[in-house]
Amino acid sequence: MAERAARHCCLGWDFSTQQVKVVAVDAELSVFYEDSVHFDRDLVEFGTQGGVHVHKDGLTVTSPVLMWVQALDIILEKMKASGFDFSQVLALSGAGQQHGSVYWKTGASQVLTSLSPDLPLREQLQACFSISNCPVWMDSSTAAQCRQLEAAVGGAQALSLLTGSRAYERFTGNQIAKIYQQNPEAYSHTERISLVSSFAASLFLGSYSPVDYSDGSGMNLLQIQDKVWSQACLGACAPRLEEKLGRPVPSCSIVGAISSYFVQRYGFPPECKVVAFTGDNPASLAGMRLEEGDIAVSLGTSDTLFLWLQEPTPALEGHIFCNPVDPQHYMALLCFKNGSLMREKIRDESASGSWSKFSKALQSTGMGNSGNLGFYFDVMEITPEIIGRHRFTAENHEVSAFPQDVEIRALIEGQFMAKKIHAEALGYRVMPKTKILATGGASHNRDILQVLADVFGAPVYVIDTANSACVGSAYRAFHGPSLLCLVSIY
């Protein structure tokens, strides 16, 4: 009996831009199974590149909804063929690429509730969507709708205070507004609009899953303080939108038991719980086990900051989301476009292309760089919108060049100081227990991490986040049915 109990597990799913991935995590929170389906490689018939279709205008970016459905079919069949024991799954949860939206056609809910276990999902859901190619987070075609939304609520700052972000082209409310304006017939035939996360949860539930607070915060529609849809924002985007979205729920809600389709076809236990799916960034916060006061810094092509906040102050830069782990708290996301490519450029220019020389320059210059400060934006930055290289001496005079060692420290200190300043603008404060979790390419350079620790005044730890959204979803599946989160709409 003990041996059987030891195999109890939760599943974490990730419906990301390029693949669907699953992990199984046991009661000790150890990953013992993982698998994935890569869209470009395993579903070539959909003709995606990087999991998406970029349209002729260069701005519209979509993904075929049936590709996501078929990927789930394939991965479950792979698990079955490998002998995976579905009967041991206590609960499951998942993540979806943020902001993307799915449009269920009138009558789709009846199909979802009466699926035949003899047929794959794709075959049965083929006619269930009013929009076959779904807008995703890479889409930037809704500038007009963004301006309309901001104007409707009194400007960008007013929208940010209300929903956690100013209007962004990828945010779901603006995408819905575009579909309503350009394809009103498809909109009128839509009975439910899901995020990618709640769409995936709906497949497992066999009925429409609600949008969770955390992923719902990336829509420009949810009032993040009151956790309700903003009537002003809904009205600015499309008619009858509230009924198409349904009521949002806390991210740790148990939204139901698994559909009988999965019980009969794969052998899931009928009591297997489905915990609300959320966005990939909120799920990553759970996967990295961030706590209040902590920061996660991803140092990649672009640099991303994840912050746990108690009292947020939304600003024009960055995003505030409801926290996926603690419904009373918040998380912030800050993206900086000039990340590793900028560091590599300065390495090439000032350290002969050598990371070893780059590190020696950081070691040979003092903290504070004798008052010399630099900001380096070779591509248009998004936090804030600025371009160019800007160097200042201790006397606050702008200069055109620094000595090589000074240049290297100015770059790294400037990058991390900007992160701290923008984090504090969103309400973040370093606490005595604060820890910084670093990931990405530059996290392998101890001297860069030392500057990060010096700027924030907190210890830095390097973590592996290869599966953080997936693993975070499995952790959340354990978290949902536990006493840690007494929220259930089941």
From Swiss-Prot:
GO CC entries: cytosol
Residues binding substrate, per UniProt: H99, R170, D280, N281
A Pfam family the protein falls into: FGGY_C
Binding-site list for ATP: W355, G441, A442, N445
Transmembrane segments: none
Keywords of this entry: ATP-binding, Carbohydrate metabolism, Kinase, Nucleotide-binding, Transferase, Xylose metabolism
Family named by the database record: Belongs to the FGGY kinase family.
PANTHER family: SUGAR KINASE, XYLULOSE KINASE
Complex formation: Monomer.
Protein name as annotated: Xylulose kinase
Species: Bos taurus (Bovine)
Gene that this polypeptide is encoded by: XYLB
